[in-house]
Amino acid sequence: PYEGEHPWADVPRDQLRPEYKSVYQQCLKLYMDHMREKGWADKIVLYISDEPHFSHEHIRVQMKALCTMIQEVEPDMPIYSSSWRHCPDWNGAITVWGAGSYGCFPEEVLRERAAAGDRFWFTTDGQMCTDTPYCAIERLLPHYCFKYDVEAYEFWGINWLTYDPWK
């Protein structure tokens, strides 16, 4: 998405290549026009990033640039990231937060962001493994959704295969 070659070490991450932006935005617009024609647009959530490393400045800047690019053509597009925690830099960019279900996304921030119009899903992953202290917490997810007014949970790994099932 940037000028030059990967890994773009010295490239400002908020300056997406104009050609990249143009092609992405055209594709997104065509896709969403199709979804609107079919009556499905209200069922779309754009999953932009899985567990972004927002402790790095370049990741925070890049995410905002990508979300801005999307919102320029689809301002009402829900943008989801399984961020686990809150990243204040992304307020207004991420509109559907993937919050950790075990307290790493503070409840008061969840309430503040919800009041600002953001939506929430609980995200799951490694803490669901059988050898962790959170074993079987998935049984509480429907209750957590009800208690915290969270609309869904992303259950990672339901079809993750580490082998070829056809062999």
Residue ranges and their predicted role:
Residues 1-166:
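Catalytic-core regions of glycoside hydrolase
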